[in-house]
Amino acid sequence: MTEIPSFQPPINATEVEEENAVFPTALTEWFSEVGNQVGEVALKLLSGEGDGMEVTPTPGCTGNGSVCNGTDSGGVVWDIPPLAHYIVGTAVFCIGCCGMFGNAVVVYSFIKSKGLRTPANFFIINLALSDFLMNLTNMPIFAVNSAFQRWLLSDFACELYGFAGGLFGCLSINTLMAISMDRYLVITKPFLVMRIVTKQRVMFAILLLWIWSLVWALPPLFGWSAYVSEGFGTSCTFDYMTPKLSYHIFTYIIFFTMYFIPGGVMIYCYYNIFATVKSGDKQFGKAVKEMAHEDVKNKAQQERQRKNEIKTAKIAFIVISLFMSAWTPYAVVSALGTLGYQDLVTPYLQSIPAMFAKSSAVYSPIVYAITYPKFREAVKKHIPCLSGCLPASEEETKTKTRGQSSASASMSMTQTTAPVHDPQASVDSGSSVSVDDSSGVSRQDTMMVKVEVDKRMEKAGGGAADAAPQEGASVSTVSAQIEVRPSGKVTTKADVISTPQTAHGLSASPVPKVAELGSSATLESAAIPGKIPTPLPSQPIAAPIERHMAAMADEPPPKPRGVATTVNVRRTESGYDRSQDSQRKKVVGDTHRSRSFNTTKDHFASEQPAALIQPKELYSDDTTKKMARQSSEKHEYDNPAFDEGITEVDTDSENETEGSYDMLSVRFQAMAEEPPVETYRKASDLAINLGKASLMLSEAHDETVL
């Protein structure tokens, strides 16, 4: 079988030489060579010598009706066997179908679930949309061309194909970089993120990503580089093979802006994320060390920390490795073609990296979305047929280990004994407040704050903190737990366990659950479904303790009074909240919409917990002081040090940008008839530090962060 000779345009045939006349010399020679070869083929066909000949067509063509195979820049013609076309085409088709399906599921879940519309998730949705459009515009054309072993469309279609691939490829890379930067800031600078990150700003950042990607996808359409066929001649990309200075400059810029810089940023961000998780943030570490009891630093906590570090390292390694494996081959091939090693860039070497690059659309929805519990729950809810394909959540299995961090605090407070309204009763001479926040946010985004209050009440007389125990006295432990689920349901539970005390110490047989306060009471959000109540409803703890202890001692309950310190990071949506009378009102002065960290100090002088006060009352400095003074007058309570303890309430009401954020509430109460200002300050400092620690933990270990 005789092979028809093929022809190849000279390497500089595309160069425009303005100094020559109508046709440059090189172009004239090329046309002459083509004419001679065509004539030779025609003579063989006319003479019958061409029967059974295998045609090796012109390489690199994109014209309609042409049959395109491969060639390298050295003029060597590659006869690509049909099997190679079918293998590559099938691989790209499978990759494209999986990528389109996975990213479509992510986008659909985002549209149907309002709980997913957080600023951080916008980047993930943008990535899914970009990958989906990449597969939609490139995969079908590539698969059909591979089936016919040639480019079936026009030159203009080749340019559009290359433009779509360039635009959405650049957008995906830039979005991956933005996600790594967002996670870096959330982990290392959480309070900065709280102040500056809003939905509007994230949307603006995404718009900039589109514009930036468009800036580098358009130039080849206007003469700076070009979109030409690549590999087996069944796809198109920017021209990195032509030895032209302007083309080389464009390739260099693309290499640095779309590979080198994003890759470097991702490595830097994930390295610092791992370092922060390993060593702990300076502020968080200092706060925990100051308020943590030595007994808390046990092996279990160290084991959780070790698992967190391993998990973070694995995720960082996977993300960086997948990015490098997807885009490094393409970057290497384009660099070889640009640096003058065109003879090494074969059609096979061009096609394989392109296939790797398209595979990024498959793993992105898995790494950044499907592994996140909120997305899985949304998929199970809105696409039930896929429930069996998704891994079970940790709440369902109860066996998987979830990354946890704990911040625990213990503080002993010595309080001043003061006369009370009932002459036969006395206040406690010593009390201990312990707060344990075990992980802040679980994989189901259930926020739990466990508060344990140990109060020692003496039956008669007022003794010092170190006084010997008296017969009939007791120690009560109140355990309160709050769970806030993504659906908006709030579950509160508070149990009182009283242990009688003998002259020789505590009884070995505590009375189990002498009183149960709001046991497992599920409070449906009075607000719009999906919203978490603001502020969080909680069961009054202090007053029931006093009533319970007084009942045990056969004494009338003292008037509830004391100090309550609250640290809140709350969820609001569209800046609206539901008040207690079920009337929808605009939240006035709701400072948490700007994600600023606020502390509120209020005097707890009634049985109604401060958390039930309306936000506009709770976060107003003047209103809080006024309420405190009124409470003091009502209960004949006058302490000059009290005003000193509530001199500031951070409102930060200048930036009231709407947003939707998770809520974490840490609350404890130090009960005393006349709390000295030093006790008040200790309580406030503990709550503030614990709030900061809990907030950082919840941000650091939320699945959107890693």
UniProtKB/Swiss-Prot annotation:
This is Melanopsin. PROSITE patterns: G_PROTEIN_RECEP_F1_1 (PS00237), G_PROTEIN_RECEP_F1_2 (PS50262). Residues 1-86, 143-159, 223-248, 336-351 are extracellular. Pfam families: 7tm_1 (PF00001). Photoreceptor implicated in non-image-forming responses to light. Photoisomerizes covalently bound all-trans retinal back to 11-cis retinal. Most likely coupled to the G(q) signaling cascade. Belongs to the G-protein coupled receptor 1 family. Opsin subfamily. It comes from Branchiostoma belcheri. GO terms for cellular component: membrane; plasma membrane.
